[in-house]
Amino acid sequence: MKNLLLFLLACSLGAAAAARPIRGSVKCGGKPMSGVTVTDGYTFTQSDEQGIFTLDADDQALFISLVTPSGYLAPLDGGIPQFYRAYDPAAKGYDFELQPWPGPDGCYELLAIADPQPKTEEHFRRLRSEVMPALQAATDNGRTRGANQAAIVLGDIVWDSPELFAGVKAEFAGLGVPVYGVIGNHDHDRNKYTDREATENYRRHFGPTYYAFDMGRTHYIVLDDIVYHGAKKYEERIDTMQLRWAAAYAERLPAGSRVCIAMHAPAMKSWLGNRGMAAAERLMDAFAGHEQHFITGHTHLNSNYDIREGVTEHNVAQVCGNLWWDPINWDGTPKGFQLFRECGGEFSWEYRSLGESPARQIRVWHPGQVAKHPASVVAKVWNWDSYWTVVWYEDGRYRGAMQRTTLDDPDYTAHIDSLKAAGRKISKVQRPRPTNFYFTARPSASAREVEVVATDRFGRRYSERIALGHTD
């Protein structure tokens, strides 16, 4: 019995030592802000009417961070919002100062950018010359319109090259908008053998690997779904600690609100037999009753897929093409990013191809250009989802819906064939990825012109005409 009591006492002392009381404040313009959520990555608290918060911080905590309220922004340092402070058991306090976010209340645009992934100085120079000007044009346009804008980089910010973190961060800081980070598998230090050690470089530049912030009427949650084992070995999984943290956060949200969960690896790989991440299922259950969106990268392809009722995943194509090797992604999606908008509670998205007009959302091939469908017009609609309609007109006459099919992208296939013909070695991740956002229609022998019209779920209409070359 004595030994048991000693054991229980030791456990209680250990538990007491596992948390330390901390204190801090949240202000805006020097005035206290109440009701702001604060977390150590394990538990939550809120600031009171004087803007003061207290929290028993876990000894394993790495940061004390705010859930930035809608309509406010933490000061930027190198483009990164400073909504966090490194946890220091000896610190006397954690004081945060927020600022109002100018622009129409509740309206914003979010640039979701996947896998910039420079590995070499050459890649970095190309990031600067090929990718950043198009992103800069998008944010410059937003400033001209007076729009609130932010960016989120969906992991693989670098490609096993932590020495490039500072340069990439500086490039994104140049956009002049808050930039939120997501950690990817290639952002881990491959020379470390625990997940905590392997994220140290990333955390030094971008802060916590999981956190939350609000914009408009949407609650954004960023998670780390890469469990790293060292030497490039990892699992696509959300660890138990983060799941508990997210579930506790879910309990604090208003019923029926919108939640966007940003991670690197997708929750569901719809193109691989709906192969899902088990932990993501638990996450969806935790946020049941909310409108849920996953925003992910990692795959170098583009997909908008309804995982279950009320849950949509936006898997965003790689912004630099396929690993800087190819001019488009291996599913045929152009280099680009997903642009999310919210205003007055209305939430929408649209793919933006780098250097192209927003109106460019489809690509059409003539009969005879696609070997698998030699007599058909073939259209690619890379941001398609099941709520789109894709119809066609022949010489101005409506002909109905086109037939959806799965294809290797003709342009990407031609590119790879040209590399092979030139004697180039092709990586296994350069194989064309069959995708189901292609549509076919067979025009009549006398047809002179075909128009393809694609309309997205928000009623936006995109079209492309081709002349078939018949003469009298």
Q: What is the role of each PLM region?
A:
Residues 36-40, 63-64, 390-392:
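Hydrophobic beta-strand segments
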Residues 250-271:
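Short acidic, glycine-rich surface-loop motifs adjacent to enzyme active sites
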Residues 21, 28-29, 68-166, 446-449, ...:
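N-terminal active-site segment of His-dependent metallophosphoesterases
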Residues 20-23, 27-42, 59:
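Short, ordered, surface-exposed loop/turn motifs in non-cytosolic proteins
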Residues 42-56, 404:
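Short, acidic Ser/Thr/Gly-rich low-complexity loop/linker segments typical of extracellular
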Residues 177, 409-440:
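Aromatic sugar-binding surface patches on proteins
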Residues 70-76, 83-86, 162-255, 274-295, ...:
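Extended active-site neighborhood of metal-dependent phosphoesterases/phosphodiesterases
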Residues 311-395, 436-444, 449-465:
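Binuclear metal-dependent phosphoesterase catalytic core
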